[in-house]
């Protein structure tokens, strides 16, 4: 009996050590993702397209919450270093300083994520996907969220934004990204705040669009390799930004070659059809069908979005 067990031992060890191909670390991340997608059912894929991604236990996929913030330090996850607001950092006119700030932020975020994961906790503000920087142009001082921006100048905003992304994501020579940064809010989103869910940008000249509002986003995509872009609440030329073929497909994907994640702002898809939004679609089903053509991730912020 002992001799038989010894004969079978190599085979048993081989079976025990075998793992799905998509978990082979020697493969590129893109190849591993491609192999993993083939294993997922349609229902599982849909569940992974929301900010609160559900686990797929049979494939070893743990839950993940995409929502995390690092506007000027790791936010809402216990103690962390608090740096000046972006508008203050912009006043330094020092891109290198901004890089050093967000390199430190990414160190803290990584450490916190490692700790939370070791405790089996995957809640909001504990992940590695930071929804920053805000590279909208601060044109009107009445806009309450202007402090989140790097000011009114597209060039300065571009330089600062590029350094934020590089500080958060790390160098491109690594096998994995340190974190994900997210360029937001795409596009032409600079107030007013009170009607951001229904405001439509119209009569904007092509020159103003390309010289004022788009340069920071283009720089973050082409120079910094930002991994995520968040579409805005407002409409652009009659289409909700999160359903705008011109913004998300023609400009972002085709013209700039962005191949990362496009996600909606918090609850933006509900604005496609609800009474206080754009009323561009009649119901949740048609709104979702339109959104999914352009989006990789849909943010669900409350009960009204789950209709």
Residue ranges, per PLM feature:
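Glycoside hydrolase catalytic-domain context in secreted enzymes
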Residues: 17-306
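Bacterial N-terminal signal peptides
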Residues: 8-15
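Short amphipathic alpha-helical "recognition" segments used for binding
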Residues: 6-8, 188
